[in-house]
């Protein structure tokens, strides 16, 4: 039994999807709240958090019960275990950070997809199949179809080699990390600099040329709208930290103004 990834279906239909990044709140209930709020998916960040895989496992189970896909950003791209283990516990996909070379991309496909596309290790009767493997070949094919594999484009080498990177079969999305990209271009903190925006526009064009979904992380509605108008379709919107902090600040200010 394989979870049907409604986020991936929406993207195939040409829709825009939105989802926040979680890196602080360790609660399965967060998945239900995001589903109730209407988000299409959410990220769990292992690159910049202290989450254990056991913590992530509980959050993923809750997300599947609430029918909201989870995309895990692993802590590293450098070995199979960083990619395959989040998928084995039921993540609907991966956002693989710090991609720079074609070899990086080929490794991602090998470690995240089953044969014949990749060479992911076989352990089908796990959380990702609700502990029932079914027919082996059918299950492998279904998992390959439902998993979304996104490359995080956040280094100048990735920008320069992007057409080669996206030509590797098995990649669904090219997702820009604006902060790291700006730093890689020598202008840290200046995500609105023309050089950064030119690089991001390049990602959109090359992704579309290769039938790959372009995506980006944004911190505001205005910024999200700006990039949607330019062609972005997979939108990462804020973080759990920023969403909570914003509503708390707004509430406190409103309460104080009532005094």
Predicted segment positions?
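Short, acidic/polar
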Residues: 22-37, 76-85, 156-168, 219-224
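Glycine-rich phosphate-binding active-site loops on the catalytic face of alpha/beta enzymes
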Residues: 93-104, 120, 174-183, 232-251
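Conserved, mostly hydrophobic/aromatic
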Residues: 20, 34, 45, 94, ...
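Glycine-rich, proline-tolerant flexible connector loops at the mouths of alpha/beta enzymes
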Residues: 30-31, 35-58, 176-194
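Alpha-helix-loop-beta-strand connector modules within alpha/beta enzyme cores
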Residues: 53-84, 88, 110-117, 141-145, ...
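Active-site mouth loops of central-metabolism enzymes
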Residues: 11-28, 71-76, 147-160, 213-218
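N-terminal amphipathic alpha-helix/helix-capping segment at the start of soluble metabolic enzymes
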Residues: 1-21, 133-145, 201-202, 208-209, ...
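Conserved anion-binding
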Residues: 81, 91-169, 258-259
């Amino acid at each position: 039994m394989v979870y049907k990834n409604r986020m991936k279906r929406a993207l195939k239909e040409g829709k825009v999807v939105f989802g926040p990044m979680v890196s602080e709140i360790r609660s399965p209930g967060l998945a239900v709240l995001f589903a109730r709020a209407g988000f299409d998916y959410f990220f769990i960040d292992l690159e910049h958090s202290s989450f254990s895989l056991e913590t992530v496992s509980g959050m993923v189970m809750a997300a599947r019960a609430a029918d909201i896909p989870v995309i895990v950003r692993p802590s590293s791209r450098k070995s199979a275990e960083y990619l395959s283990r989040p998928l084995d516990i039921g993540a609907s996909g991966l956002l693989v950070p710090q991609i720079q070379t074609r070899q990086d991309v080929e490794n991602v496909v090998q470690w995240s997809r089953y044969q014949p596309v990749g060479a992911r290790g076989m352990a089908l009767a796990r959380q990702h199949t609700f502990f029932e493997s079914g027919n082996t070949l059918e299950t492998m094919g279904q998992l390959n179809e439902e998993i979304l594999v996104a490359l995080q484009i956040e280094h100048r080498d990735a920008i320069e080699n992007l057409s080669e990177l996206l030509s590797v079969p098995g990649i669904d999305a090219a997702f820009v990390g604006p902060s790291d990209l700006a730093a890689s271009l020598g202008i840290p903190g200046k995500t609105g600099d023309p050089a950064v925006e030119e690089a991001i526009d390049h990602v959109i064009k090359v992704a579309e040329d290769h039938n790959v979904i372009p995506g980006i992380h944004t911190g505001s509605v205005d910024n999200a709208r700006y990039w949607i108008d330019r062609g972005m379709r997979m939108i990462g919107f804020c973080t759990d930290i920023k969403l909570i902090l914003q509503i708390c600040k707004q509430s406190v200010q409103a309460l104080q103004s009532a005094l």
